[in-house]
Curated annotation (Swiss-Prot):
Active site: 42
Keywords: Oxidoreductase, Selenocysteine
This protein's record includes keyword Amino-acid biosynthesis: no
Name recorded for this polypeptide: Glycine/sarcosine/betaine reductase complex component A2
Its biological purpose: In the first step of glycine, betaine and sarcosine reductases, the substrate is bound to component PB via a Schiff base intermediate. Then the PB-activated substrate is nucleophilically attacked by the selenol anion of component PA to transform it to a carboxymethylated selenoether and the respective amine. By action of component PC, acetyl phosphate is formed, leaving component PA in its oxidized state. Finally component PA becomes reduced by the thioredoxin system to start a new catalytic cycle of reductive deamination.
Length: 161
């Protein structure tokens, strides 16, 4: 399902770092365009870093929004939801390059079954297993799914799940 996908990884210093997500994504044969680890709650009011917004917008223009998959690693549901809202419906703070830009990108958190069940299980356990135990996985999944269903134009096809 993830093989040959073009992936942008937004890890979280207090959640799951970009490097851990990257190891999982690469184990599934995906191509990582960009990977970073940010402090989701450190940025102004939880808004996505402006430089990251610029890079995401550039990749969507270069490769087509339908070909981009965003994978998040946020520690909290609300912060992860803000990131998902930004890449699907536009920057809710109207501060960055994605203000008013509805890319509708395919966006998932690494703990969601659509991602977790499609990467190497041993790599996932080694890189993410411990952190997953302390996250409120159900709340994160509900938050991301809500934004994805409301604003996402591109989601992983059922056949891919």
């Amino acid at each position: 399902m993830l093989k040959d996908k073009k992936v942008i990884i937004l890890g979280d210093r207090d959640g799951i770092p970009g490097q851990a997500i990257e190891a999982c994504i690469k184990s599934a044969g995906a191509h990582v365009l960009f990977s970073t680890t940010e402090c989701f709650v450190u940025t102004s009011a939880g808004a996505m870093d402006l430089e990251n917004q610029k890079r995401i917008k550039g990749f969507a223009e270069e490769f087509g929004a339908e070909n981009i998959l965003i994978v998040l690693g946020g520690a909290e549901a609300e912060a992860s939801g803000l990131a998902c809202e930004t890449v699907t419906n536009g920057d809710p703070t109207f501060a960055g390059p994605l203000a008013g830009v509805q890319l509708g990108l395919s966006c998932y958190h690494v703990v969601e079954p659509e991602i977790k069940n499609n990467v190497d299980a041993d790599v996932y356990d080694e890189q993410i297993g411990m952190m997953e135990m302390v996250l409120d996985v159900d709340a994160i999944i509900a938050e991301i799914k809500g934004y994805r269903e409301q604003f996402g134009k591109y989601v992983l096809a059922e056949a891919e799940v």
